[in-house]
């Protein structure tokens, strides 16, 4: 199974202090090495602009290979997502005006094309243009879970 991580879930890793939760980081490393944990270049760009704690930031820099460049098929699927007018709101006004990275549609497309699962901390909200809403849409149909569910699927407990 491939898991495509959104910025929100990678950022949440800061709560798992490496000195206390060594097994989390060991498990994540195993998934990175097997190619099961990936993300997108756009997520990396968001992380670089964000406020990520030093450990998580260094961990991600040391594993930068997980941040894939969108394929032609993924970009075509992003275009399909945006054909649904409501989902054009995935690109917020700030991103449009300032040209800041927009990872959400690329994360979804990456998971769709690679038959993976999106991992995000965004929540399903009625009538919203959020990752879970897009994933749930009939024309998209991509599994979407949060970090806690991801860890449960790995069989991790602390």
Regions found by a protein language model. Give the residues of each.
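Short, well-structured N-terminal submotif of metal-dependent ribonuclease cores
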Residues: 1-39, 46-60
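A structural signal for short, well-ordered beta-strand segments and their strand-loop junctions
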Residues: 4, 38-40, 119-120, 143-146
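Short Gly/charged-rich anion-binding patches and loops
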Residues: 23, 55, 106, 129-133, ...
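PIN-domain endoribonuclease scaffold, especially VapC-family toxins
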Residues: 41, 45-97
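Active-site neighborhoods of divalent-metal-dependent phosphate/nucleic-acid chemistry enzymes
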Residues: 73-133
């Amino acid at each position: 199974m491939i898991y495509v991580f959104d910025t929100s879930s990678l950022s949440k890793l800061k709560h798992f202090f490496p000195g206390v939760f060594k097994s989390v980081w060991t498990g994540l490393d195993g998934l990175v090495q097997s190619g099961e944990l990936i993300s997108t270049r756009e997520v990396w760009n968001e992380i670089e602009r964000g406020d990520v704690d030093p450990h998580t930031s260094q961990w991600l820099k040391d594993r930068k290979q997980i941040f894939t460049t969108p394929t032609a098929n993924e970009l075509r699927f992003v275009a399909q997502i945006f054909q649904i007018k409501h989902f054009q709101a995935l690109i917020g006004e700030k991103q449009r005006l300032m040209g800041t990275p927009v990872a959400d549609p690329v994360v979804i497309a990456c998971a769709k094309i690679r038959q993976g699962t999106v991992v995000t901390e965004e929540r399903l909200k009625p009538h919203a243009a959020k990752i879970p809403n897009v994933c749930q849409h009939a024309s998209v149909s991509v599994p979407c879970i949060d970090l806690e569910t991801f860890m449960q699927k790995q069989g991790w407990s602390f």
